Structure formats: C-alpha cells, structure tokens
C-alpha cells in the first residue's frame, strides 16, 4: 500500500489556503463506505424484507 507521504509527493500538496482542511480531506474517501454499511444496518433493522 502506498504510504501517505509517497501519495503526497505523487499528487502534490494542497495549496496553503486549504491546509486547515487537510484532516477532513483525509477522511472524505471513507464516507461512501459508511453509506454502504448504513444500508446493511438499515436492512438488518427491517429484517431484510
């Protein structure tokens, strides 16, 4: 797996104006996975009708 440091060198750093948002941007790719898990929890709650 590519480490965060190598990925940053490959894609470049964020412009300085966006540096405060860096931790948020690191979490954003996880959001679609959370929606997928939410779908399973929802179906389990309604017993997979």
From Swiss-Prot:
Point out the propeptide residues. 1-12
Q: Say yes or no: keyword RNA-binding present.
A: no
| Classification via InterPro entries | PSII_PsbK, PSII_PsbK_sf
Q: What's the protein here called?
A: Photosystem II reaction center protein K
Is Protease one of the keywords?
Answer: no
> Species name for this entry?
Phacus acuminatus
Q: What is the membrane topology noted in the UniProt record heading this document?
A: Single-pass membrane protein
Q: Which GO terms describe its cellular component?
A: chloroplast thylakoid membrane; photosystem II reaction center
Q: Where are the transmembrane segments?
A: 24-44
**Assembly and partners?**
PSII is composed of 1 copy each of membrane proteins PsbA, PsbB, PsbC, PsbD, PsbE, PsbF, PsbH, PsbI, PsbJ, PsbK, PsbL, PsbM, PsbT, PsbX, PsbY, PsbZ, Psb30/Ycf12, at least 3 peripheral proteins of the oxygen-evolving complex and a large number of cofactors. It forms dimeric complexes.
Q: Which UniProt keywords apply?
A: Chloroplast, Membrane, Photosynthesis, Photosystem II, Plastid, Reaction center, Thylakoid, Transmembrane, Transmembrane helix
**Main subcellular location:** plastid
Can you tell which superkingdom this protein's organism belongs to? Eukaryota
List where in the cell it is found: Plastid, Chloroplast thylakoid membrane
Gene that specifies this protein: psbK
The family this protein is said to belong to:
Belongs to the PsbK family.
